[in-house]
Every structure is written in structure tokens, then in C-alpha cells.
From Swiss-Prot:
It is found in: Cytoplasm. This is Isoleucine--tRNA ligase 1. Belongs to the class-I aminoacyl-tRNA synthetase family. IleS type 1 subfamily. The gene is ileS1. It comes from Pseudomonas fluorescens. GO terms for cellular component: cytosol. It is an enzyme of class 6 (ligase). Gene3D superfamilies: 1.10.730.20, HUPs (3.40.50.620), Valyl/Leucyl/Isoleucyl-tRNA synthetase, editing domain (3.90.740.10). It comes from the Bacteria.
Length: 943
């Protein structure tokens, strides 16, 4: 038997079938580094339009988790796709370096008695070490960026830039010092930002407390009575007994109806709607003897239950019904609403009672409870209330309560003297910060769109921003306060620039070591030098100033506004939020044009990642076992706008999809063996109809993919590339061209036409996958035929694809119809194979009984229909002649009959043909193969 293998154009490529990503990816990273890929991208991007994605800095603490990986990969995919779209898309990664978590880590490691200077030194060293660890992990993900020169909020230039940003906001008239209740953590010993507050369940004591009337006549008058026949009291309900010693007022709603209830031994004031539930709670019988609106009770004095002072009634719209008594006890030092109401009624700061120290312990001088920790004082306070006859009822509840994000301990609101950026303070010129920010939100594009309403609601309802902290490791607030007036030095902005210049040379230590006389001269004794530091959200919130127009200038001619900020959805109250406020205060617009948010990672059942649940997926483990490209494909395959599921099973599915894409690319490469695009590429008009369709289909898909990339819809990109590989290519086109590729002449038009199509498709595909499968794309790039530069990323979307003319006879709709017929034939072939009626498809002969229109269409392929259907014979017959055993299909007007061929199998092409052995010199092969070996070769027109 003759071996005809040498006469075939068998596929061949050195591109490995097995990806071996964990081993190969580090080699590719090394290559990118050695050729200076990121630098080359900046070089070719010089004259391109710029796209600026500004990196929200992760905190310089700990190893990266899967959420970090998701975030960085999304950013990299966007920037790579923008580069391929013809933009200059730089990426400057950054780190958030100051703040309590690092200071806390240093204190835990070295103790709390280090001294401020040593603490800062150790914090800086710790942050530096953490950044190096995280940096190598991010690079391993295939993220291209300026890793040799990232921005760090602790770099001297950035610290100085932050001071300059603050100076701009001071100049704008937004900064003030005030006594206000702020989120306070006893363990931190400092105020916390809104973004540092978490809510967890807490068990608390609830109490109903009676405040006895101090002015009987006024209360009687308010209820339309001549006098009060019995002692009277107003009843409040609270979940914070520890605030009772600081009570200074009682709040009622001006429009609610309040009842005077006779309960036998006294009269109680309660909201009318709450009378029934309150009496049931107190186990009392009673009757309503009079009612009055809340506004009638204004300024009536009641007595504190155990201190000799008065508590007047103030009107407050925030009072609600539904729980409690309809009366809210008011401690202005420990509640934002309480504080606002008391200030509205003329209470000055010196009158506010604030007995809780920074560590959560009452001042020693507080009568009855001095020296006690507030959360342990609930019971002594309850006992005191019971002793004086003021306790109506007590119970325990489980409720959602604010906790420190770092220590997981309960917080309180505590009035302290702090520095604020005012939301409604009249600035030097223009609108208030709240008005500016709300307008800026309207001018910003949000992906997904619901982010706009979320951020709008937060800005509309937020209090003034407390920007000061009482910590060591932070950028200083370099203010001098007049000891007498409490006012800022008149040259504050000028002095801040002098300080910024020193910080730029020496770091924040320059301020802390500064002798005031160096700057103020003879004025120094008149001023206090402030030791507060800035909220870390101010650090990251001003990166648009100290990075984009500071340490790493980049942006557009219209100003350094970024095109995109991309972070997790929690950043609506974090980085997006603080950046919006500082941007509007400094520039009167948001520092970004578009906000994109992604959800959080969960396991496949929707549970959060937790070590206790043993469902944590570490990026390093994925890199070491599957490869970063599999992680990147998982990211691309998921709609990131909601929760993003990840597990070993989900990653395994991504690995399967990866193999399909890789194998498709490898098949095309292997069939490009011996193809030189410089000499073998055919013009479109010389290509076979099927090949022209394949290139046209690739072009249409490329347009769709470019649109999806532009909208950051990577899951659409992934699914369409995968489907293209599985269906149009793997399930149709690549199957059909195998015979032509392998059996026709090596330099025949039939083969070169297919190779031309494969070349065009491969050139397009390698670019499509480059933003997602960063490593694999560059590996594939090296094996493509023809001269090329060092990386796929140094190019733009492929422009060599051609469109089918509108009048092309075998156009798009035609091939869609043929594909449907092929699917129907394949389905019947599977049935026949399962029944052992035929072996392989090439043992089959198929007759298509079709209606006239379909017959005419299929007849256009002439005798090449069999190559499309991959059967040895394909015959057409009228639909009306279909025998009873012909099989109906899902294609209208088509029935099929498949039989096993009676003809011998060609040893070369494996088709069963009647002319096998006709040529005595080649008794084992068909006439077509004889012609391809020793004759002029077959001529194909369509497929």
C-alpha cells in the first residue's frame, strides 16, 4: 500500500498545544521588560489622542486578594483595548500610604511608646515594603504600567502636592474649624471618615425615661387645660443610655399630635400615635385627657432626671414615629441632628456638655459615673434612673450599629474641635460645594448608570467633611491659629506654600520638626502650630491634583481631568466621593469624565470570600496552577456590574474556554505553514467565495468587538470570540477547508485562498484577544507568518479585512442559509453514526430533498456542495420526491436521506468515490487526488 502522506499539505506549527501558562507567562513578562514594552507604547503614543485612566490607589498593606486582581485586570483590559484603538493610554499605578491601618500595624509590632518621629519612620519603611510585595503580584497579572515609577501618597512630592491642594481649597473659602459630632473610634483615638465606618449587629439596652415637668403652667396651657391635676413628665426612648448624662434638650416633631395621658399617679406626654404601644410596654392603664401639636410644646422646660438642669423642648423634623415614644432625647455632643437643632436654637459651643473623653471614658468630674467606660455604664445609668423614679421600661435589642472598619469595635458620634470642608459654606466665589458637586454628578457618565443616583443621594445628604485626624502618620494640616481669636494666620495660603516646598525636600517630617519662629518670626508666640493630620481620603481624593498635575503630569489640553475612574462600588462613598469634593472645590468640576464601578467577588453560591468558610481564592494560587490568562479570561467573562462569582469550578470552565480559543488559533497557525504573506496573499477578488465570506464575517465581528470594548462590555467580547471559535470557525469554516488545505496543490489558488483567509482571521483574532489574554496573544504573535514588530500591543486593530460587496452572489445571507443546512445534515449524520449505519461522515452519501428556492441556492455550489457538507456525495432532489423514510429538518422545505456509500474509500482524501482505482498507477486513490498529485490539480470556485 502506497503512503500518500508526503503528498498532503499536513498542518504543522511550533506553537505549543499545551499552554503551560504558569511556566510560560513569567518568561513573557521578562521579555516585555527586556524590550521595554511600556516605554515603546509611550513612544508610539506621542502623537495619538490621550486616554487617561487614573488609578485609584490600593492601600499599602498586605498581599493582594482576588478583588485587587479583578480591579487591576479590568483596568489593564481597558487600557490595552484603548491602545489598540489608536489612543495613547498610559497607566501610572499608585498606592495609598498614610493612615491608621499602617500606624496601627507599627504600634502592634513595636509598641505604642515609640514617639511620633520614630512612628513615622517605621510607617514609611513598612509601607515601602508592602508596596514592593503588591507590585510584583500586580505585574504577574500581566498589567502593563509605569511600575518603575508609580505614584505613592507618601512620596515627598505628593505630600507637598497634597498641602498645595489643601491651600487651594482654603483659598476657595471652603475650610473652617468647628465643634461638631464626628465618627469617633476609641481604639483609633481619632475621628473617622464616612468610608471607614461599617455597620454590624450590636446588642444594646433600650430605655424609656420620664423627664419631669419644670413649668406646669406652660404645659397645661399647651394642652388647653387650666392647670395640671397631677405631676407630669415627658417620656423619651433611646438605644444609647450612656448619652443621658449629656442630655440638654428634648425634640418633638412640630406637626405630630401629642397626647397628655393620665396613668393614675401622674400624667405622661407621648405622641398620640404611640400611646397604645407605650402603655402596653409600661404595663400601665391610662386615658388621653388632652392633645396638642408638637409646635405648641416648643421651649417648655422639663427637668433632667438626675442632674439639676433643664431640658427644653425643641422642634425637629427628623423625629419619627414607628418605635419609641415620638419624643427624642437630645445630646448635642453625641448626635449630628441633635447638634444641628441645638445650634439652631442658639446654643453656643461652650454650653455643649461633652463628658466623654477620647478613650470612651467619662471625665472623672462627671457626677455618679465619672471614670466609667461609656458602654459599661449602661447598667449604672439604668439603676440611677430606676432609683429616681424616671425609668419607665428597659429592654435589650439587636440592631445595626456603626463600627470601626479596622478594629471592628462600636463607634460613637463625639463632638470635637476639627477641621472641616463645608458642604454649604459660602465660598469665596461661586456656588457652595454641595451645589457644585451635584451639578458635576449630572455632567458625569456612570457605568452602570445606577451609580449616578447612588452618588447623588450621598452628596445630597452628607454632612460637612471632617478632614482632620489626631494621628502621627499622615500629611499635616500646616495651619497656625491665633491663640486669642482662634483665627487662621492671615498669610495662611502663602505659609502653606513655604511648608509645601520644605515637605517636597524633606517629607512630612519637615512640618513636625518645624519651629514656628522659622516662618512667623516675632509673631510665633501669638500662634499655635497645629499638629492634626489629614484624613487619608483627602490623600487619595486629591491625586487628581498632586499626581495628574504634580508627580506624573498627564491629561488633556482641556485640563488634567481623567477620562475614567474605575473602582469597586464601595468607592461611591470613598475615592469617587472624596475626589469629587476636592475636584469641585478646586476646579469647579469632577476630576473624571466617567465613573465605572464593579461589584465584589463571591463564591459560586453567592457567599462573600472568608477564610472561615474556606472559599477564598488567592490570585497567586491561580497564577501558579492555571496561569494569569485564565484569571483574565474569568474577569472578561463576567458581568462585573453586580457580584462576581469565582471558584475552582468557575475557573476550570474558564480554562476550558481558553483551550478552545487557543486550539482554534493553533489550528489556523498550523495551516499557515509554508505561507508567506508577502508573496502568497491573494487579493479579495481572487479568493474563493467561502473564504471571502469568512473574512467578511471576521470584519463584521471586529466591528462588534470594537464597540463592546469601547463600552467596557468584556463579557460580550469574550462570548462573541468564543462563539466565533466554536461555531463559525470550528463548527463550520475550519472543518470545510481541511480537505482543500490538505489535498490540493501546495501553491494552488484553492489552498492559498484559504490560507489568505486564515492569515487575515489570525491577524484579527490575535488583536481581539490581546486585551484579555495578554500573554497568549503575544505568544501567538511570535508564530504568525510575515515580518512583524515585537508585540501585538505595538499595533492597532487589524485593517486588512475586506467586506463582501452588496451585490456578491454568495453573500452573507446565502452562507447563513448554508450553515443552517449543514447543521441539519450534521444532526442526521450523528443519528446515523450512533445507529452504526455509517462510520465517519465521509462514508456517507446525503440526498437533500429541497423546495425549489432552496434547491436553486444549494445548486450554486455545484459539485462543491459535498465539500461544504463534508460527505462523499451530496445530491439535490425535489422536495416532492422525498421518500417516506426521509428525515424532516428544522430548515423549512428540507428533508434528508443519508446512506452509507457503496464506493471504495480513497486512501489519500478518505472520500468514498466511484473513481477510486480508475488510474492503474494509483489504484488506491480517487481521480481528484490523482489530478492533485500529478495533473494540473483540481479547481475550486466556491468552497
Amino acid at each position: 500500500m502506497t503512503d500518500y502522506k508526503a503528498t498532503l499539505n499536513l498542518p504543522d506549527t511550533a506553537f505549543p498545544m499545551k499552554a503551560g501558562l504558569p511556566q510560560r507567562e513569567p518568561q513573557i513578562l521578562q521579555r516585555w521588560n527586556s524590550i521595554g514594552l511600556y516605554g515603546k507604547l509611550r513612544e508610539i503614543g506621542k502623537d495619538r489622542p490621550k486616554f487617561v485612566l487614573h488609578d485609584g490607589p490600593p492601600y499599602a498593606n498586605g498581599t493582594i486578594h482576588i478583588g485587587h486582581a479583578l480591579n487591576k485586570i479590568l483596568k489593564d483590559m481597558i487600557l490595552r483595548s484603548k491602545t489598540l484603538s489608536g489612543f495613547d493610554a498610559p497607566y501610572v499605578p499608585g498606592w495609598d500610604c498614610h493612615g491608621l491601618p499602617i500606624e496601627h500595624k507599627v504600634e502592634v509590632t513595636y509598641g505604642k511608646n515609640l514617639g511620633a518621629d520614630k512612628t513615622r519612620e517605621l510607617c514609611r519603611a513598612y509601607a515601602t515594603e508592602q508596596i514592593e510585595g503588591q507590585k510584583s503580584e500586580f505585574i504577574r497579572l500581566g498589567v502593563l504600567g509605569e511600575w518603575d515609577n508609580p505614584y505613592k501618597t507618601m512620596n515627598f512630592k505628593n505630600e507637598a502636592g497634597e498641602i498645595r491642594a489643601l491651600a487651594e481649597i482654603v483659598k476657595g473659602g471652603f475650610v473652617f474649624k468647628g465643634l461638631k459630632p464626628v465618627n469617633w473610634c476609641f481604639d483609633c483615638g481619632s475621628a473617622l471618615a464616612e468610608a471607614e465606618v461599617e455597620y454590624e449587629d450590636k446588642k444594646s439596652s433600650t430605655i424609656d425615661v420620664a423627664f419631669p415637668i419644670a413649668d406646669d403652667a406652660k404645659l397645661a396651657e399647651a394642652f388647653g387645660l387650666a392647670s395640671l391635676a397631677k405631676p407630669a413628665a415627658i417620656v423619651i426612648w433611646t438605644t444609647t443610655p450612656w448619652t443621658i448624662p449629656a442630655n440638654q434638650a428634648l425634640n418633638v416633631h412640630p406637626e405630630f399630635t401629642y397626647a397628655l395621658v393620665d396613668v393614675g399617679d401622674r400624667l405622661l406626654v407621648l405622641a398620640e400615635e404611640m400611646v397604645e404601644s407605650c402603655l402596653a410596654r409600661y404595663e400601665l392603664q391610662g386615658s388621653v385627657i388632652a392633645t396638642a401639636t408638637g409646635s405648641a410644646l416648643e421651649l417648655i422646660n422639663f427637668r433632667h432626671p438626675f442632674y439639676d438642669r433643664l431640658s427644653p423642648v425643641y422642634l425637629a423634623d427628623y423625629v419619627e414615629l414607628g418605635s419609641g415614644t415620638g419624643i427624642v432625647h437630645c445630646s448635642p455632643a453625641y448626635g449630628v441632628d441633635d447638634f444641628v437643632i441645638c445650634k439652631k436654637y442658639g446654643m453656643v459651643n461652650d454650653d455643649i456638655i461633652n463628658p466623654v473623653q477620647s478613650n470612651g471614658v467619662y471625665v472623672p468630674s462627671l457626677e455618679f459615673f465619672g471614670g466609667q467606660f461609656i458602654f459599661k455604664a449602661d447598667q449604672p445609668i439604668i439603676e440611677k434612673l430606676r432609683e429616681v423614679g424616671a425609668l419607665m421600661q428597659t429592654a435589650a435589642i439587636q440592631h445595626s450599629y456603626m463600627h470601626c472598619w479596622r478594629h471592628k469595635t462600636p463607634l460613637i458620634y463625639r463632638a470635637t474641635a476639627q477641621w472641616f470642608i463645608g458642604m454649604d459654606k459660602e465660598p469665596t466665589s461661586g456656588d457652595t460645594l454641595r451645589v457644585r458637586s451635584l451639578k458635576a454628578i449630572e455632567d458625569t457618565k456612570f457605568v452602570p448608570s445606577w451609580g449616578q443616583a447612588r452618588l447623588h443621594s450621598m452628596i445630597a445628604n452628607r454632612p460637612d467633611w471632617c478632614i482632620s485626624r489626631q494621628r502621627n502618620w499622615g500629611v499635616p494640616i500646616p495651619f497656625f491659629l491665633n491663640k486669642e481669636s482662634g483665627e487662621l494666620h492671615p498669610r495662611t495660603v502663602e505659609l502653606m506654600e513655604v511648608v509645601a516646598q520644605r515637605v517636597e525636600q524633606q517629607g512630612i517630617e519637615a512640618w513636625f520638626k518645624l519651629d514656628a519662629a522659622e516662618l512667623l518670626g516675632d509673631e510665633a508666640p501669638l500662634y499655635d502650630k497645629i499638629s492634626d493630620t489629614l484624613d487619608v481620603w483627602f490623600d487619595s481624593g486629591t491625586t487628581h491634583w498632586h499626581v495628574l498635575r504634580g508627580s506624573h503630569p498627564m491629561g488633556h489640553e482641556t485640563g488634567p481631568r481623567a477620562d475614567l475612574y474605575l473602582e469597586g462600588s464601595d468607592q461611591h462613598r470613598g475615592w469617587f466621593h472624596s475626589s469629587l469634593l476636592t475636584g469641585c472645590a478646586i476646579d469647579n468640576h469632577a476630576p473624571y469624565r466617567e465613573l465605572l464601578t464593579h461589584g465584589f467577588t463571591v463564591d459560586e453560591t453567592g457567599r462573600k470570600m472568608s477564610k472561615s468558610l474556606k472559599n477564598v481564592i488567592e490570585p497567586k494560587k491561580i497564577n501558579d496552577t492555571l496561569g494569569a490568562d485564565i484569571m483574565r479570561l474569568w474577569v472578561a467573562s463576567t458581568d462585573y456590574s453586580g457580584e462576581i462569582a469565582v471558584s475552582d469550578q468557575i475557573l476550570a470552565r474558564s480554562a476550558d474556554a481558553y483551550r478552545r480559543i487557543r486550539n482554534t488559533a493553533r489550528f489556523m497557525l498550523s495551516n499557515l505553514t509554508g505561507f508567506n504573506p508577502a508573496s502568497d496573499l491573494l487579493p479579495a477578488e481572487d479568493m474563493l467565495a467561502l473564504d471571502r465570506w469568512a473574512v467578511d464575517r471576521t470584519l463584521l465581528l471586529q466591528r462588534e468587538l470594537q464597540e463592546h470594548y469601547g463600552e467596557y462590555r468584556f463579557w460580550n467580547v469574550y462570548s462573541k470570540i468564543h462563539n466565533f471559535c466554536v461555531q463559525e470557525l470550528g463548527g463550520f469554516y475550519l472543518d470545510i477547508i481541511k480537505d482543500r488545505q490538505y489535498t490540493t496543490g501546495a501553491n494552488s489558488k484553492a489552498r492559498r485562498s484559504a490560507q489568505t483567509a486564515l492569515y487575515h482571521i489570525s491577524e484579527a483574532l490575535v488583536r481581539w484577544i490581546a486585551p484579555i489574554l495578554a500573554f497568549t496573544a503575544d505568544e501567538l504573535w511570535e508564530y504568525l507568518p510575515g515580518e512583524r514588530n515585537e508585540s501585538v500591543m505595538l499595533n492597532t486593530w487589524y485593517e486588512g479585512l475586506t467586506e463582501l460587496p452588496a451585490d456578491f452572489e454568495l453573500g452573507r445571507e446565502y452562507w447563513e442559509g448554508v450553515m443552517a443546512v449543514k447543521v441539519a445534515v450534521n444532526k442526521e449524520l450523528e443519528v446515523q453514526r450512533a445507529a452504526k449505519a455509517v462510520g465517519g461522515n465521509l462514508q456517507a452519501e446525503v440526498t437533500l430533498f429541497a423546495e425549489d428556492g432552496l434547491t436553486a441556492d444549494l445548486a450554486k455550489l455545484s459539485n462543491e456542495l459535498r465539500f461544504v457538507l463534508i460527505t462523499s456525495t451530496a445530491s439535490l432532489a425535489p422536495f416532492t420526491q422525498a421518500p417516506a423514510d426521509a428525515v424532516a429538518t428544522e430548515v423549512p422545505g428540507l428533508k434528508l436521506k443519508v446512506v452509507k456509500s457503496a464506493f471504495p474509500k480513497c486512501a489519500r482524501c478518505w472520500h468514498c468515490r466511484e473513481d477510486v482505482g480508475v488510474n492503474p498507477e494509483h489504484p488506491e486513490i480517487c481521480g481528484r487526488c490523482v489530478d492533485n498529485i500529478s495533473g494540473e490539480g483540481e479547481v475550486r470556485h466556491y468552497a
